[in-house]
Amino acid sequence: MTTVSMREMLQAGVHFGHQTRYWNPKMKPFIFGARNGVHIINLEHTVPMFNEALAFISNVASKKGKVLFVGTKRAASEAIKEAAVSCDQFYVDHRWLGGMLTNWKTVRQSIKRLKDLESQSVDGTFDKLTKKEALMRTRELDKLEKSLGGIKNMAGLPDVIFVIGADHEHIAIKEANNLGIPVVAVVDTNSSPDGINYIIPGNDDAMRSIRLYTGSVAAAAKAGRGQDLAVQAEQDGFVEAE
């Protein structure tokens, strides 16, 4: 089972919160104290809470569940995409479009348009268009890929969303809440933990911290998927003889 240790969190700077003047009082139970005007997060809470979240994600993946990684702020977007791709899951790394979950019917139509344009770009359709029309479709394709590329193969709503930066991604969290989709989120000292099923109190700005979260969640999803494949192989009679 994927777990993260206190040492790994300390090395990644997970315990460094925001400046004390920007704090959200709802995070008080998870704060150890302050140092040089910066809140220090109590990792005695974070370690078990994160490991519980990892176990949950692994369990979801073991049942063929879909995990949606969400992180659109600059510090998180690259790591979010890399982690989701590495475990064959889904991501939103550019901008959360309002209604991405709650208005899935419309989003699905946009995904269909994206896939149509992708086909046209490779089957020679673009070559038959005027230069101006081809340019317009290429721009539309790029725009749709940027917004929806990470969810174009999701085929339905996710079973859990994993969020870096609860404050920044409050719309995504609210949409998931409205649909009863569980939320796992990294919550810094300036954010509210409301509406989050699995709270991970921690630094949501430092690259090392972010990569620790995303890498661990990807590993948990992979491990869960591995369990699912092992069960499937056993059912299909493909178990190797010892």
UniProtKB/Swiss-Prot annotation:
GO terms for cellular component: cytosolic small ribosomal subunit
Highest taxon, organism lineage: Bacteria
Keywords carried by this UniProt record: Ribonucleoprotein, Ribosomal protein
Keyword Ribonucleoprotein among UniProt keywords: yes
InterPro entries cross-referenced by the UniProt entry: Ribosomal_uS2, Ribosomal_uS2_bac/mit/plastid, Ribosomal_uS2_CS, Ribosomal_uS2_flav_dom_sf
GO biological process: translation
KW Lipoprotein (keyword) present: no
Gene Ontology MF, one: structural constituent of ribosome
Annotated Pfam families: Ribosomal_S2
Similarity annotation: Belongs to the universal ribosomal protein uS2 family.
This protein's name: Small ribosomal subunit protein uS2
Native source species: Shewanella halifaxensis (strain HAW-EB4)
Organism placement in taxonomy: Bacteria, Pseudomonadati, Pseudomonadota, Gammaproteobacteria, Alteromonadales
Gene: rpsB
